[in-house]
């Protein structure tokens, strides 16, 4: 997705997924300077490539084939999206937030690219370095970084999110043994400076 510049010079080459606490979602795509917003409907997975209308067509194709006997197995974005979407529709819906995160993690593990994976001549395929999950009801944001020994979360109900509050940061390059709630690892920091 080769979007033209936005936000003072940034170029977005990925899809942005937005979900509110009610579960309503939108997919934002930047396409040659145009912002396109899509309602994903019953699609529960998203990757950065290909463009959303093409991805919907690929998912519709695999929906007809079914996935009980065969799913695409490469590391390409479309194949990973098909696997994640299929499994998200074929797992138990649970009320327990911890179990829901565990189920989500297992689906994403199945659709990730192994860490340090590299194929020459395939610049659009890179290894998965992190996964994140949001519990919108309980306002917890989970992080699963491959170089960290566990996965952890920030409890947003315990963060000061008011205008003018201190910026807090968790330096994931220095924290490799986090598990569970990680609010105590947040440190005051200068605001994030974009690379552009």
Regions found by a protein language model. Name each.
Residues 1-40:
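Structured, non-membrane catalytic/scaffold regions adjacent to prosthetic-group chemistry
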Residues 9-12, 21-23, 44-196:
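C-terminus-biased signal that marks the final domain/tail of proteins
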């Amino acid at each position: 997705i080769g979007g033209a510049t936005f936000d003072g010079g940034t170029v977005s080459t990925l899809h942005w997924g937005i979900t509110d606490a009610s579960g309503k979602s939108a997919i934002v795509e930047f396409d040659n300077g145009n912002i396109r917003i899509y309602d994903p409907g019953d699609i529960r997975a998203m990757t950065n490539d290909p463009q959303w209308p093409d991805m919907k067509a690929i998912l519709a194709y695999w929906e007809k084939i079914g996935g009980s006997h065969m799913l695409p197995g490469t590391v390409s974005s479309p194949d990973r999206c098909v696997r994640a979407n299929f499994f998200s529709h074929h797992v138990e819906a649970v009320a327990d937030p911890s179990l829901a995160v565990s189920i989500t993690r297992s689906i994403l593990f199945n659709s990730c690219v192994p860490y340090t994976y590299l194929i020459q001549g395939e610049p659009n395929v890179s290894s998965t370095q992190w996964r994140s999950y949001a519990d919108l009801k309980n306002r917890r944001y989970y992080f699963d970084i491959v170089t960290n020994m566990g996965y952890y979360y920030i409890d947003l109900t315990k963060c000061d999110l008011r205008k003018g509050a201190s910026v807090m940061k968790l330096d994931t390059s220095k924290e490799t043994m986090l598990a569970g709630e990680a609010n105590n690892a947040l440190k005051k920091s200068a605001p994030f400076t974009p690379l552009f």
